[in-house]
């Protein structure tokens, strides 16, 4: 059985956090197949995970270091009753929005149809590449706002509270441990502890 997780610690935690953040849902339980596909590797390099969210929604997560042609390849797809969303880190300025019964639309970063939170995260005019480094700048800005608010004994700007917390990090570690446990039990469903 897999006793530690290299691929999943470095890649899967990001996909896990992204799915929970975008949907606003926590994961209740999972069933995982964490494996070593490259002969001689001591730690995993591939994981397939089935997810059950707290509202009953289903999901799946694939995390791999053995998928040639993918440059990091972090991608999120969310489907609901009214629409689907698709985002890829390899094309971070675009969000594919597919309402049921309508043609899909591509929403661009900095475009007029975006809400306040998306506009706040945009640092440079649309048409210019933006993403990875600016994402860190947004985190630092929001953390600085929280620190300033605490020192001034005031409430921070609500938009600055969207940054990951220590609790989010702890939940990510629990997610990894549950996936490793599930895989060691041949993909049995494991309940995530709160």
List the predicted regions and their residue ranges.
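Predominantly a Rossmann-like dinucleotide-binding segment in NAD(P)-dependent oxidoreductases
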Residues: 1-41, 47-48, 95, 119, ...
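Glycine-rich phosphate/pyrophosphate-binding beta-alpha loops
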Residues: 13, 39, 62-71, 128-131
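C-terminal glycine/acidic-rich active-site capping loop/insertion
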Residues: 21, 29, 48-53, 82-163
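C-terminal capping/lid region of NAD(P)-dependent oxidoreductase domains
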Residues: 181-194
């Amino acid at each position: 059985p897999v006793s530690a997780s290299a691929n999943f610690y470095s890649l899967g935690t990001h996909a896990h956090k992204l799915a929970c953040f975008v949907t606003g849902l926590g994961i209740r339980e999972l069933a995982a197949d964490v494996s070593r596909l490259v002969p001689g590797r001591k730690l995993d390099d591939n994981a397939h995970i089935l997810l059950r969210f707290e509202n009953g929604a289903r999901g799946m997560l694939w995390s791999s270091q053995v998928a040639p042609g993918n440059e990091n390849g972090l991608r999120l797809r969310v489907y609901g009753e009214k629409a689907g969303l698709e985002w890829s880190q390899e094309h971070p300025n675009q969000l594919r929005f597919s309402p049921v019964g309508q043609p899909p639309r591509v929403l661009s970063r900095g475009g007029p149809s975006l809400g306040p939170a998306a506009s706040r995260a945009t640092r440079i005019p649309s048409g210019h590449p933006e993403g990875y480094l600016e994402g860190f700048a947004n985190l630092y800005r929001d953390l600085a706002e929280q620190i300033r608010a605490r020192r001034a004994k005031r409430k921070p700007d609500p938009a600055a509270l969207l940054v990951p917390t220590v609790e989010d990090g702890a939940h990510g570690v629990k997610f990894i441990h549950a996936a490793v446990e599930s895989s060691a039990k041949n993909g049995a469903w494991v309940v995530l502890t709160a």
